[in-house]
Amino acid sequence: ADEIARLCRLPGLEAEGLFTHFADADGSEAYTMAQFDRFLAARAALEERGIAFKICHCASSAAVLQYPCTYLDMVRPGLVLYGWYPAEELKGLDGPGLEPVMAVKSRVAAVRSLPKGTPVSYGRTAVLERDSRIAVVPVGYGDGYPRSLSNRMVMRVRGVECPIVGRVCMDMCMLDVTDVPGVQAGDVAVVYDGPLLERAARLAGTIPYELMCAVSKRVPRVYRLNGVSVDKNLQPL
């Protein structure tokens, strides 16, 4: 506390806030409360030395859902802003419940009819077992879509789940749309929604939040209020 107080008194420096971050707020209540108590003790020690902070905060999404006593001056919801729970055990703690609000969509760029035996994408990891219609979707690992989902994941076109065929490329991937009548260039391909994101995270051995954060800057963001884009120049697919 003495060292922090000394730093706060440096000329030209105004210490405005004090914060910590819970290590296991979606797990152990005892550990989280012990961490919170240590934080409060540190704040009190600084106040005894004449250092007061305008804003003190520590409540992450898991704490927001469970521990109102940790709210202090503000809270830091992250994952819950996307409509996701930090842990399965926390579902139902917020009354009506959260619903995923983020989706990633693209459009089919081209559709090709290919004969049985045709290899698809880099490395020829997929060889068509029947005459097929293959759709090209301009989404790849350059957009944050995991290459590890090659030959494993699906996207949704015209309401039907279509498997990824071959390796995910930097800027595109290929879907088998043989069983979806009428697919054509311009059709919307749902890359992620709630169920698809959860499935993709499970296959990739990670959590949905990592995949959401991985969506690269080159992917346009469309923010909607009551179903309407807040930017008239960007419209949702």
Task: Briefly describe each language-model feature range.
Residues 1-107, 111-115, 181, 232:
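Active-site loop/helix belt of alpha/beta enzymes
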